[in-house]
Structures are given as structure tokens and as C-alpha cells.
Amino acid sequence: MSLGELLETCRSRRIELWSEAGRLRYRAPQGALDAGLAERLRAEREALLEHLEGGPGWRAEPDLAHQRFPLTPVQAAYVLGRQAAFDYGGNACQLYAEYDWPADTDPARLEAAWNAMVERHPMLRAVIEDNAWQRVLPEVPWQRLTVHACAGLDEAAFQAHLERVRERLDHACAALDQWPVLRPELSIGRDDCVLHCSVDFTLVDYASLQLLLGEWRRRYLDPQWTAEPLEATFRDYVGVEQRRRQSPAWQRDRDWWLARLDALPGRPDLPLRAQPDTRSTRFRHFHARLDEAAWQALGARAGEHGLSAAGVALAAFAETIGRWSQAPAFCLNLTVLNRPPLHPQLAQVLGDFTALSLLAVDSRHGDSFVERARRIGEQMFDDLDHPTFSGVDLLRELARRRGRGADLMPVVFTSGIGSVQRLLGDGEAPRAPRYMISQTPQVWLDCQVTDQFGGLEIGWDVRLGLFPEGQAEAMFDDFVGLLRRLAQSPRAWTDGDATEPVEAPPQALPGSARSIAAGFAERALLTPDATVIHDAAGSYSYRQVAQHASALRRVLEAHGAGRGRRVAVMLPKSAAQLVAVIGILQAGAAYVPVDIRQPPLRRQAILASPEVVAWVCLESDVPNAGCACVAIDRLAADSAWPPPPAAEVAADDLAYVIYTSGSTGTPKGVMLSHAAVSNTLLDINQRYGVDANDRVLGLAELSFDLSVYDFFGATAAGAQVVLPDPARGSDPSHWAELLERHAITLWNSVPAQGQMLIDYLESEPQRHLPGPRCVLWSGDWIPVSLPTRWWRRWPDSALFSLGGATEAAIWSIEQPIRPQHTELASIPYGRALRGQSVEVLDARGRRCPPGVRGEIHIGGVGLALGYAGDPQRTAERFVRHPDGRRLYRTGDLGRYLADGSIEFLGREDDQVKIRGHRIELAELDAALCAHPQVNLAATVVLGETHERSLASFVTLHAPAEAGEDPRTALDTVRQRAAQALRRDWGSEEGIAAAVAALDRACLASLAAWLAGSGLFASATPLDFATLCQRLGIAEARQRLLRHWLRQLEEGGYLRAEGEGWLGCAERPAQSPEDAWTAFAGCAPAALWPAELVAYLRDSAQSLGEQLAGRISPAALMFPQGSARIAEAMYSQGLHAQALHEAMAEAIAAIVERQPQRRWRLLELGAGTAAASRAVIARLAPLVQRGTEVDYLFTDVSSYFLAAARERFADQPWVRFGRFDMNGDLLDQGVAPHSVDILLSSGALNNALDTPALLAGLRELLSADAWLVIQELTREHNEISVSQSLMMENPRDLRDERRQLFVHTGQWLEWLAAQGGDLACGVVPPGSALDLLGYDVLLARCKTDRARLEPAELLAFVEARVPRYMLPAQLRVLERLPVTGNGKIDRKALTGFARQPQADLRHGVAQAPADELESALLALWREVLDNPSLGVEQDFFGAGGDSLLIAQLIARLRERLESARRHPFDRLLRWALSQPTPRGLAERLRSAPEEGRGPALAAARGVAPAQTGMSRAPLAEGAVALDPLVRLVPGEGVPRVLVHEGLGTLLPYRPLLRALGEGRPLLGLAVHDSDAYLAIPAEYLNACLGRRYAEALHGAGLREVDLLGYCSGGLVALETAKSLLQRGVRVRQLDIVSSYRIPYRVDDERLLLFSFAATLGLDTAALGFPAPERLGQAVQAALAQTPERLGAEALAGLPGLADLVALRGRVLQAASGSADAASVERDTLYRLFCHSVRASQAEALEPYVGALRLFVPDAGNPLVPRYAEALETQWRAAALGACGIHEVPGGHFDCLGEALAQSLSKPMPEEASQ
């Protein structure tokens, strides 16, 4: 007996132990301490003393009885769990129970008894303060008992009353800071009396409740009974527990638990709904009972096996959870009654003594229930021997090590077996409740068992909204059924798993026990001259193939081929492959296909098998094989007919060996027998009616088992096989040609190849081809969009999904694909083929329950013989089931659906846990593919164990419809850029002369340096090697020397003769000094500043010293680190300024075309920021007006990056990063498909291979991207004698042509070749800039691609999967990589994902920006006990957890005045969403108390003093629930006002008083502008509706009225839909003048007018025409382009031409001054524009309820026939009744008293249903 068991025995016998002065003391009831136990106590005396003295002793502190004391860890968890900010939170830890009392119960007497207990028990007077402390009130008033007098009700009415009380109390969440917390009620009927107890377990636990009920009954029955005063208190107990945490025992227990921590499993992986409701707060109670006889029988059987009855109940629960858990190892959360014998009276004290203990369970261990129960019991007692380090402590450590979410252990076991009755002793025992339900925060399932009422009471409380329909009931029934079996049957304890009845083993199809080639042979004899196969060379009959195969057979037999031998085949895709395999099989041997593209070492590994006696290949491919090689193309066909019969083989003989990739890196050879494969071939031919009329396209390689069907299944049926040309085997256009040429009827491929064909055909919409009648897809996931796309092309094709494994005869399972399957997350896997079995089994070989994931096992006649030469691997994968069947473990995961079919869930590798959540990658891929622009999606897992994350990749469709002509936009941008080039350049002749003088000066310096070689003095040519030797030219500079020689030759200094050079006799005689003086004299200073001229001269005159290394080229250009020369070269010249301004204007023109779009710019080689300055300055006003720009400034040099960070520090939208254009472009932190504008000034020429660079950059470009490039476009001798000495040698055509630069034409050719759909130069030919040799190049790329922002796609996916499933990386690719077999290459994707996404921000840890950040940082460091944290440190990343963040919030509210203005729960939500000091500071700053301008003040509140960016108007005493605002208190069904386009409740001000009389009035307002704007407009209303419904549901509302005005009506509609899905009744949905705009608004003038009108500004004073005139202009423009109001549609109206000035007037008027409240004003305008864009989304989806539409009688001047338009839209949206009501006023002023009166009239009851 362990020490823990000894203590438990003493507790069970009510023996109290304590230490006193080093001696062991005890107190025991008579007869409880027998001789054996006394001896045991003496033997364990020292251990007991050590245990009892390990913690601090009892310390009574009566003087502090009414002072605050801390919560226990469990209490703190309960309090924190009440916050709805946490998943599975938002509810109390509460029990509601109903007890029968006598019908004649005296309420006054019962009330007196209750108050007597309140006086005796301090915790009945306790409250919780500040969510962190508890306090016992010294005095409380007399507590009145709520009594419902129902004696006048009949039985039915009384039961209805009880139901109403139950509905009100069974999920009550009592206010813990207000006494009384416990408020029992009494219902007295005619014949019944029911006591209602809603008990918050934060103050008293279940055992305390039983003590309370027992004492209450005793006091009621005997009012004179006097209980002994309680000296012990719960407060004193908590003090002991607090001090215990400083004891050696706590440290010892902590060490024990932490040593086990990394090995602890996570929570049970129970199947959940596709979208579990993490905000659900409702529970359902299940109850069952073992009668006393059954319970005694179970206890007796437990005793026979040395187990306790309580331990058996726990083991049975673990067994049940293990049956349903998709991971066999998991932790259960045990609640433990922690009442140590610290004080004799502690057993009578009320309080929450609950402790938690995590019990690790592995359901795989143990061959019988007894063994597993013993193991669990031993583990539990070991755990309970280390109790001082609590389960809450352990959960916090789990969260620290594994991340947020790991601390969720939501499956709880609570046992009161024996313990409750022992605690009650001989006192009054309460009766069993007539009804009971409990709920606990962050708990999914709570199992409670107790024997206190005789028999065993079994209860489960299950959170609703998590588990699939019927699952909780099935799990509960399993648990109860197991307990009943254990009580009834001895075999249930000792037998292994009881297997379910097994159907008769699958039987092979008749006629399948033969060679796989027998069907071909029969067909050859039957129709010898029928065509059997087509390849690139021609067509062949059965006779031809058979005769060639016969010839091959003879040769192979001569080399020893026969039964038991193998012959390898390495041939390209052709008819020769069919000849080879038929010949090999006729010889009785097995064939081994080897892909001709495989690496030599892999081929050698296959060849190493001693059974391989020969190879068949082409003469040109004969390998050095070490065995006989037969060149099939040198064999002549046999002429004999019929050919000799095939060698006799047994059905179980080997037919072929296919090698697949092995997990160890060594290929594994799968050996299939003839009988196994023949059964599949026969089933497929019969199933799909394959006959001689069919043509199958043989896409599969011979080494892929789909080819087995093509060659042996199709040919046996007489069908023809069509093979693609091996040179075009992966070309879908070639497949299309074959479909047309051969009228293919049977398509057999992996899904990716079907996808490739459809992708190609969709790009050729005019091409019409005959389609296959039957399509077989297998080998990989089938994208759910593929069937629909296929049917769109060929609606008559029958589509089938086939599955299985190479180890099981090609296929084992089939699913006909139906249209409804395309709406699922994945195509179902289906049912087994004939002769085979496919089962989903758990780790113990049991059939998984429906919905539970397990491993797919294949059985039946199709199983392989095993793996060639690998008995160990064969034994691992081919296993014996307990019932004796042989099964193949596929490693694939699946689950049974309700109809018994199987759903495929991917490989085990496709399952991952992220922060404790089980994720199926297929579900995420399906959600991504559901987006209409996504073509394919694939997700991979990154990282190990607790650091795992997801990376998703998608490819996109082409745009659904063509936009504007790309040439038009390109020409517009070019014209804007060209205008920026206009300058007073002076005389073009003078510029040309200066350029020529500069060239002469450079050449003169070169010639003078070259003279040192003796070249000009030599009479014979000097070869290149001699020149290099004489001049001392290193190899790295020899290319530059060749360039110089060419330039000197063109300049008349020398001429080439043969392999050498000679000086020209009549070469220019000008000296370098004279030449440079001449240039300086004619060079315009505006183009060549004096400092630049001096630098060029100095560099040209010191070539020898630079080449010798005596002078550094870099030091010349950057003297003493100064950039002044670089500034003179790149920035100061007139040409540099013009070029950079042209680039800036071009980029501005591009951005201004779509100012609402987010623009991502990447500048390469930014260097001195010469171009950057112009571009950033030009973009800054656009950013200020609301355009979102992300500008990434890059260079290879940290020198330039540091300077740029300082220069642009005031532009937060500019980021910085290192980028090496000559490195791997995908390895530098810029994601593919993420750049909208790529700009570069003079840098791309520095690339080693410019065409390759442009090709790589294309991968980074998004759809419809732009290149804006400035480059040198002629040879510049001044560069060749200066900067070229710092440049590397190019490897493109510049090297071949001895050039440093290329002309504009070559640049345009490169751009066109590398994805520039359209490209042009800006500089006019013959202009000054052209003479100087410069151009600005524009290219527009990927105009044929759809555009999709990853953020937009993430928002789309967020509506379909839980947040924990969202990928950490999301990248858009041109195409997904595929393997040789056409499957998605996930290994390659993992490599892509591991390419770094560099942190390209400012990079330096920043100090606190103000006092608020400093204060928050101090709190972060204090709570986390880490002084090194920074302002951007994530709280949870630094080791924080949910309990610590609650402490942080409590301290925050204590210390910061700005935080005390906000309720605890709001601060907690903010901290969870922005868990950094800087992020939380920003949230606090963005909720100011006062506004800044009159218009904005009105927008944000009822009066200017109540404004704030993140808060809607608050009436006096109103409470903000973020985004929910309580405006007016009241009783009854609340009315909820939904904000309009400003995100505010401004328009409702006239209605507040009228609507708020007598009933609650709530509002929904935008609380986080950034979050609102981050939601893509097309999903905004639906996303808001979902979030607002969550807020209303989380606030406990179950019935509401909704009111939405303007765009708020659209949001209200979506909110109503989501509320209905959550079970909340929408009694009235009222829509006021809400209009979905049926066209796109591109003219900002209309937005500005609507914004001003909504704010109530004087639109005429702002310069707008009359609204009617504006409306007429809108309609006139729409008559021309109905789908779009063009960007300049209203520009011709008076006063509206200057959009910039108009915008300035409106925004100034909105803020009340030119600069006040500009940030708030601009944000408000952005909110409004975003809301308008959301109102332009697709047509309204139907709403299944009724609604009322209120139409202003004066209409909307911007919309003709407004009433009719509104009625049409909303009648179509409402499937229920749609009442139309006219109200006075126009759209902008209809919210008045008349509307309030109309709204007050209730909707007819029949319409509201």
C-alpha cells in the first residue's frame, strides 16, 4: 500500500491524522482503526510525519475574518472563465438542481433556517471583488426567500411554471460581487413543493452543497437544533494553501510534475462539428442510474480484481473517451475534493475546496479492462501523492511550453463515490434531485458519478454546439452500457476488446484466379487484327503485340526468366511497354517497371534484387546493369500464329513489383499476385461496362499502378489504349488532341491531370471536344471544384472517385461523384470494391464509431504479398486482426459517415495539432478552394511538435471577365510620366557635344593607361594574353579590358588584327588633361555638377592604381564614407531629377486609378534613395487621403538601408529590408504574388543575368502588376572607367557582346519575354534624355490573372473554418509543383514555405513612445517577472497565460486612470487581441473621452462631450459591451440599433427617447476601425453580421428586435441570419431606407456628397449642386455604363471639377477646422467609403424570416423610383412576409417621430414566425 493509498484508507474510515511536536496523532471513530491498519501506521510513521509536516500548519486568523483574501487557483479559473473573450467561456461554474419538499412546507420556517445558515457559514456571506479577491461580509440583511405560490394551478400549469423557473435559472450567471450570490427559490403547488437551487461553485463546491442541504433540512425539521460554532473557516484554509506553496513539499511535487510535463498528452481528440460554436454557453444534461443491486454487483466484481468501485467508474469513463478520441493518449481533468485533515472542523466548512489533477491515459495499454483499470488507478494514486502542485499550476506550465490553447483540458471527471457520504457522516442526507444540470467554463463534457443516494447516479453535462448531432448521446450510452456490462458479466473484465460481428470474408469474383495477362491473350485469339494500342509512332493490333511479345519471351526464357523470376522494364511510353510486360508474363516471370527518368542510383537499388534476371529497354538506353539486357527495338516479331500458350502460373504467383518511395529513402517494392490484381480488373470492367467500343487514354507511367488497368484491364475488354507522345506527356494541349483524334471514352488519371486538362480547355473556350463517358480519378485529393468544372464542359460524363493503395491491387474503394458532393469539404471515399474490405479501425483494432477518425485498413483478396526483400516492413504494414483476418495498414486516415460510407481524411501526416486543436488539412484546402477565384489549394505543416504551423498555397483562375483594355491604362501612365520629363534642357546640340566630349576624355585616359603595355609602340599586334600580362589584369577584370579595347577600337585608337590589336597611326592626339579640360568647359553644370566631373576625371586618370589595388574604387566614390559624389551623380543633375519625377508621376498615375486598393511597392537597389525620395513624396498625399500603401525600400547594402531608415522615419508606411537581386529571390522574405508595383532606378543593369532576374521577379508580382524602371540605354564610357570597377561580370548577352549596357529595344524585348504583357519606353527618341542615354521603362504584367489579396482570401476562409485553422502563411503561386505521377509535390511546397519571410520592418527594438506605453511595459515585466521585455513583446509568447493576463488587467485598472474607464471584460478582450504593451496602449488611446469637432462629435455621440472614435453614443449610465452598447435600460425584449455606414449611431438620435421607453435599447457600433477596414468589402456585411450575432448571443440574449437604417439595414439582415443559426429568435426585423447599390461607384464625388449629407453638413455651401441635379447626372452616366459610375462621371457639374479641392472642403467641414481631428475625420471617411463599397456587393441572399420595410415618402434624389427599387430588393430578400410602410421625409431625414410611432407597432404574430 502506497502512502497515498494509506492516507485514502484513513480518509475513507474518517480517521484524522496530524502531527504534534514531532509525534503522530490521530482521531478515529470506534472500530475504524483495526490492528492491521494501526500496524501499517506505525510502519509508515516517518513518512506520514514528513507528509503532514511538509506543509504549514493551521493558523486561525479571526481578526482578519472580513479582510480580502485571494482566490484559490480553481476559483480564479472559474472567475476568469466567465469572460466571453475566451473560447468556451462566458458562463459561470454553476449547478442548478430541483429538490422535492413536502407540499406543506412552511416558507417562513424554511427562510429562517436558511438565514441561520447564512449567519453560521461565512462563505454564504462572501462576494468576489475585482475578479481576483474574495471577502466575507461581516453583516448582511435578512435574506428573503423567493416563494412562488402556485396552489391555485392545476398540474399542467404548475409544470409549465416549473419549466419557466428552470429556464430562467438553469444557466444563470449570478453577479459574484453582489450579495447574495446564492438565491434559492421555492415553488409551492397544490400537491408538490419544489426547491430551486442555482449554486455558483466559485463559492461552494458540490460537497459543500450537500452539507448545506443536509443542515438546512435538519434546521427546518428541528428549529431548536443548535450547531456547534465553527472555529475553522475557508479563509484560514486558503491561507494554509497559500503558505503551502512556499514549502519543500510544493517544490518536491512541482519537480515531480514538471519532469512528466513534456510527456503528458493533450486533451481528448473528440470529433467536433465542422464549425464548433466556441461561444456557446448552453449545456445539456444526460442522466442514468445503476440500481443498488447492479452497483453492489459492480463493486463486488471490482473487489475481486483488487480495484475500488470509484476507480472502476473512472476507468470506464476513460475507456469510453478512448473509444471516441481520435488520439489514443489524452489527459482527463479530474476534480478532487481537497479537504486535508488540517483542522477537526474542516469537514463542516462550506467553500470551494476543489482541486484539479490531470490524469494521463493511453487507451492502447493493457489487453483487458482490468489491466487498463489497474494502470489508470496506479497513475491516479501516484498523481494524488503529489497534490500541492495543483492541476491549475500544471495547466499554466503547459500553456507556457506549448502555447495558448494547450491549457484547455475540457473533459472532466467528477466522482462523489464514497467521498460525499463520508463527508456527510451520520448527518441529514439530502435526497436525490428531481432535476439537475451544471456548466463549467472551458469544459466540453463533465461526467459526475455519485453513490450517495443508493445505487450509482450517472450524469453528463455536455456543452451544446460542439459535437455532431447524436454523438453526445451515443457516447453517454456507451459509458452507461459499459458500466452495466461490468456489473453483469465477468468476461467484460478480462476479455480483450469485444469485436463487432464480422461479415463473411470478402470472396474473389468468379474467374479472377488467373494470370493478369490471360484476358489480353483471349482477346488476341478472338480478335487478332483489332487495334489494341496507339502511340506516337502508330497503331498496333493484338496480333502485332502478341507476336512481338512472343519473340521477347523466347529471349527472356533463354536468360532464365520464368516462375519466381523478375524482369525489369525501362522503356519510354510506347507500345513497346505493352509488348514487354505481355512477353514477361507469358514467360511466367513478374515484371518490374522502372521509370526511365529515375536517378541511376535508384535504378541500381531496384536492380540489386537477385530475382531480377534481365532488363528490357531500348538499345540506346542499355544500362550497366550487371545482368542480361534485352534491347526490345532490335527484336523481330515471331511470325507464328497463334503464339505458344503462356507458361503456367499459379493464381498466387507474383505478377509485378512496383517500387514506391520509402519513408527511409530506400524504395520499397510492392509485390502483387495475379489473383489479387485480376479480381480488381474484373470488377472495374464489369462495374463500368468496359468493352471493345472504349478508348482509354493511358497517362499513367508504367511504374504507377494506374497503368496496370490500362494495359491489362482495358485490353482484356477489347478497349483500345491511347498513349501520349512521351515528349509531350505532361502537355494538356496534347491530351486534348488525343481526346479529339481518338474519341477517348475512358479517362483514368490522378485528379491533378484532370485539373490540368480543364485549366487548358478553359483557356480555349472556342474549342469543343468529345468527352469521356466515364472518368476515373484516384491517387490524390479530388478538388471539390473539379467535378463541376468538368461537367460544365462535358455534362454527360460519369465521374468516379477510386481509392486504395499500391499494396492492394490498384483500387479498393469507389464513390460515384454526385453534384451534391461538390458542396462538401471533400469528395467521400465511398465503399469497398467486390472481394475487398475497407475499414476504419482505432489503435486497438476496433471499428471506429461514426465521425471518429481512425486508420484505414484494407482486407480481402486484393492484398499484396508484401514488400520485396523486406520482411520487417511487411510485418509492420500487413497485420493480423484479432479475428484472424490479414489487413493492410494504409497509413491513411478516414472516418465513417452516418450512412456507413467512409470519408477520406488524408495521410496521418495530413493531420496536425496546432495549439491543441486537431486540424484536417483537407478541410482547410476545401475552404480555400471555395473562393471563386481559387483554382487549386494545398496546405503543408511546418515545424515540430509544439511549434507547428500551417502554410497554404493557392493558384488562381483567370479573371471571370475582362476589364479595361490594358493598353489604354499603359498609354495614360506613359503620358503622365512623359509630362514630368519636360524641362528647359537647353540646346540639344550642346548636350550632344558635351556627351561626345565626355566620351573623348574617357577614351583618352584609357589610351594613356594602355600605352604602358607598349601597344602603341609595337609594330606587331599584341594578343590578349600579352596585354593582360603587361597591364597586370587579373582574371576577374579581363572582361572589362575586352570592353575597353572594343571602345578604343570604335574611338579610332586601335584596330583588331587576327587575335591581337595594333595602335592606329592616326589615332586622336588629344591628351587626357586637355580632353578633360575641354569636357569641363562645355558640360552644363545642371547635368554634370563640378564634383561629379572631378570624380570621373580622377577615376579615369587612376585606372592603373585601382586595378593594382593601390586605390579603392569604392573609396573614390565614397570619400571618407561620404555620399556627396553619389548625390551629385544620382540626385543633383537635372536629368536625374526629371527621370525620378517621371517615375514618381507614373507610379502616382497607376495608384490613382484605384485609390481604394492596397498597393504594395518593392524598390530594388534603392541605394542613395534618389528615386525613392521623389516617389515617396509623390505618394504621401495619396496616403494622407486614405490610400493604403506598403512601400518596401531594399538594397543589398546595410549602409544605404541605415541612411534610408533615418531619412524616411516619419513615413510609417515605408519599410526596409536587404535584397540581393543576384541571390535566390524566393529566399529573401518577399512572398510570391505580393508585389503590385516593382520599381528600380539604374539597378537592374547590375544583375549578373538580367533576363533571369526579370523571370524571377515575375514570381513576386501579383496579378495586374506594374514595372517602373529607369535604366541607361547606351554605352557610358564614364561608367566604364569608374563604377564598372565595382561591378561583377554579367552572364547574359552583355557578356557575349562585350557591352555594359543595352538599348531600350533590348529592354523591351526582355520585358516582353519575361511576363511584361505590354511594355514601352517614356523618353522620346532624339530628345535630350535620349542623347544622354536614359529611359524610363513601363511594363504591365499578368493582366490575364485574377487578383486576390491573401488577406482577402483569409477573411473569406475565416467565415468557413475556426480561427485556429487559419494558416500562418498564405502564398499565391503561378502553379503548384507536381511529382512525376502528377500528384501535388508537398515536399516542394514545404521547401517553399521554409524560405524565410524576413522581418522587413524597421528592425530595431523601440523604446516606449509615451508614459502610457512605459506604464504598460512595467506591468508586463512585473506580471511576467521578466525585466528584459520590450513594448512589442507578445504576452503569451513571453510565457503568459490566461490567469496571468487576468492579473495584469486587475493591476492595470488599479493603477491607470485611463484603464478604469473601461470594464474588466473589455480590457481583457483588448489585451487578448493586442497582447503587447504597444498594442494595448494603442487600443486605450483610440477610445478617448472627448471628440474634437462638432460634426464628428455629433457622429460619435449624443452630444460633443460624449464622442470617441471607438464608441457609439452612451446615455447616462449606459454600459459599452464592445461592440454592443446598452443605451437605455429596461425590461422585456431588447431592440438593437445597427450602425449605419459611419459605424455610428448618429442617425438614431431623434428616436432614442421614443424607442427607449420601458424596454431595453441596445446599439451595435464600430469599436475597432482598423479591424472594420481590414475586412474585404465584399464580405463586410456577412462578417459583421456573424460577429454581431456572436456578441448578442454571448450577452445571453435569446430574443431581440433588430433595426437597421441605410447600410445598417444590410448589416441587420446578415445579423438576423446569423442569430437564427444560433437559436436566437428575431422577433422583428425593421429596415429603414436601406438600399443595395446595383452598380460600382468609382466617382468619389458621389461618396463625398453622401458623406456630407449623412453628417448633416450643408452640401450647397460645400459647392455641391442640388441633390436632384446630382441624381440626374448619376442616371445619365449610368445610362452609358450601367454597371459602373465612372471616375469622372460627375466632374462636369458646376463646382465639382476639382476633386482634390472638393475633398478638402468636405473633410474640413467634417472636423470643424482645417487641422483639428484630422485623424478621426479621415478614419470616419474611410469607414463610410468602405461601407458604401460593401453595399455594392452581390444581390441579397434570402432571409427565412419576415421583415418590415420603411420607405421615406420623399425618396432619395440619387435613386429614381426609390420606393419601387427598395420594395423590389427587399421582397426578394424576405422568404417570409415583407410589410411595406411609408414614413415622412427623405432618405437623409426620415428618422423622426413618425417613424418611431410606426416602429412601436408590433409585427403581426403570424408574420414574425
From Swiss-Prot:
Catalytic activity reported: holo-[peptidyl-carrier protein] + L-cysteine + ATP = L-cysteinyl-[peptidyl-carrier protein] + AMP + diphosphate
Gene3D superfamilies for the chain: 3.30.300.30, ACP-like, alpha/beta hydrolase, Chloramphenicol acetyltransferase-like domain, N-terminal domain of ligase-like, Non-ribosomal peptide synthase, adenylation domain, Nonribosomal peptide synthetase, condensation domain, Vaccinia Virus protein VP39
Region span, Thioesterase: 1584-1797
Protein keywords: Ligase, Phosphopantetheine, Phosphoprotein
InterPro entries: AA_adenyl_dom, AB_hydrolase_fold, ACP-like_sf, AMP-bd_C_sf, AMP-binding, AMP-binding_CS, AMP-dep_synth/lig_dom, ANL_N_sf
Domain of life, source organism: Bacteria
Carrier domain segment(s): 1407-1488
Enzyme class: ligase
EC number: 6.2.1.69
Residue(s) carrying O-(pantetheine 4'-phosphoryl)serine: 1442
Cofactor entry: pantetheine 4'-phosphate
Annotated region described as Adenylation, given as residue ranges: 520-915
PANTHER family: NONRIBOSOMAL PEPTIDE SYNTHETASE (PTHR45527), PYOCHELIN SYNTHASE PCHF (PTHR45527:SF10)
Stored NCBIfam families: AA-adenyl-dom (TIGR01733)
Family to which the UniProt record says this protein belongs: Belongs to the NRP synthetase family.
The protein's name: Pyochelin synthetase PchF
